């Protein structure tokens, strides 16, 4: 794996000179190998090691190289044709393979090859981009989008119209991460490498990027780029220092543990008790 990483790094440094017609066959094979490993979940752009998320930038470089190496081709769809560099993940699946991987894919759901979809996952008409990792038991609801290299944990619910931001460039940026057992409410957007920690509940219409203030009303603490584990979050605003205006913020209204989540429904958790 280390030798593969070094070859990808070297090819990326020379990317300005790489085109579909000039690329060396060995580089093409290395990049295709990485895409295949991402597709199978054998590697992932980010993984949690000793409680901390680590980003494997060389895998992102391989994904970016793929856009320089592979040319556009015609891709057959059920009701139309497409013209793109990245094939569709399920293009060669048959009934036996869908059953073996325990994936349910509703018509018009689009998943690009190089993204991993775990067992017992349901994909409503949605979009999962290249390099993404969607773990077991997750629901990607209608018109939800999982961006490039985003990491979605086990037993997550991405409600209708949710946007999970992608991140290929800038290269140093970390991917957006939704940890296990989270619920993301309809039309919410989590972007720019924000991490929503395990067991959190995000209400409908909450927008969180790196500059969004995430205010804990119980402690007065303000977080950036991270929703603490077990948070229940709604959209709101905070007053300016001068008191003349207010600006948007995400508000942590309460904290819940796994035991409470098991006993109480999502709708109940989102009811604010002053």
From Swiss-Prot:
Its main location: cytoplasm. Transmembrane segments: none annotated. InterPro entries: DapD_Trfase_Hexpep_rpt_fam, Hexapep, Hexapep_transf_CS, THP_succinylTrfase_dom1, THP_succinylTrfase_N_sf, Trimer_LpxA-like_sf. Its EC number is 2.3.1.117. Pathway: Amino-acid biosynthesis; L-lysine biosynthesis via DAP pathway; LL-2,6-diaminopimelate from (S)-tetrahydrodipicolinate (succinylase route): step 1/3. NCBIfam families: dapD (TIGR00965), PRK11830.1 (NF008808). PANTHER family: 2,3,4,5-TETRAHYDROPYRIDINE-2,6-DICARBOXYLATE N-SUCCINYLTRANSFERASE, MOLYBDENUM COFACTOR GUANYLYLTRANSFERASE. This is 2,3,4,5-tetrahydropyridine-2,6-dicarboxylate N-succinyltransferase. It comes from Shewanella baltica (strain OS155 / ATCC BAA-1091). The lineage of its organism: Bacteria, Pseudomonadati, Pseudomonadota, Gammaproteobacteria, Alteromonadales. The gene is dapD.
């Amino acid at each position: 794996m280390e030798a593969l990483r070094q070859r990808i790094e070297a090819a990326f440094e020379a990317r300005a000179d790489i085109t579909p017609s000039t690329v060396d066959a060995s580089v093409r094979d290395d990049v295709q190998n990485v895409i295949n490993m991402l597709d199978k979940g054998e590697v992932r752009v980010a993984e949690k090691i000793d409680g901390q998320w680590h980003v494997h930038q060389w895998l992102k470089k391989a994904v970016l190289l793929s856009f320089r190496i592979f040319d556009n081709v015609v891709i057959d769809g059920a009701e139309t044709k497409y013209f793109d560099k990245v094939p569709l993940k399920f293009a060669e699946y048959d009934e036996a393979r869908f059953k073996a991987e325990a994936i349910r894919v509703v018509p018009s759901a689009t998943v690009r090859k190089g993204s991993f979809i775990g067992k017992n996952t349901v994909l409503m008409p949605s979009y999962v981009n290249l390099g993404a990792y969607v773990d077991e038991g997750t629901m990607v609801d209608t018109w939800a989008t999982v961006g490039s290299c985003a990491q979605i944990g086990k037993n997550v619910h991405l409600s209708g119209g949710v946007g999970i931001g992608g991140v290929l460039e800038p290269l140093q940026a970390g991917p957006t991460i939704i940890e296990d057992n989270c619920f993301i409410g309809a039309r919410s957007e989590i972007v720019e490498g924000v991490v929503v920690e395990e067991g959190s509940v995000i209400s409908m219409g909450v927008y969180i990027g790196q500059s969004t203030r995430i205010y804990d009303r119980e402690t007065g603490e303000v977080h950036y780029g991270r929703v603490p584990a077990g948070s229940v979050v709604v959209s709101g605003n905070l007053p300016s220092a001068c008191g003349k205006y207010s600006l948007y913020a995400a508000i942590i209204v309460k904290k819940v543990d796994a035991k409470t989540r098991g006993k109480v429904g999502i709708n109940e958790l989102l009811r604010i008790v002053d």
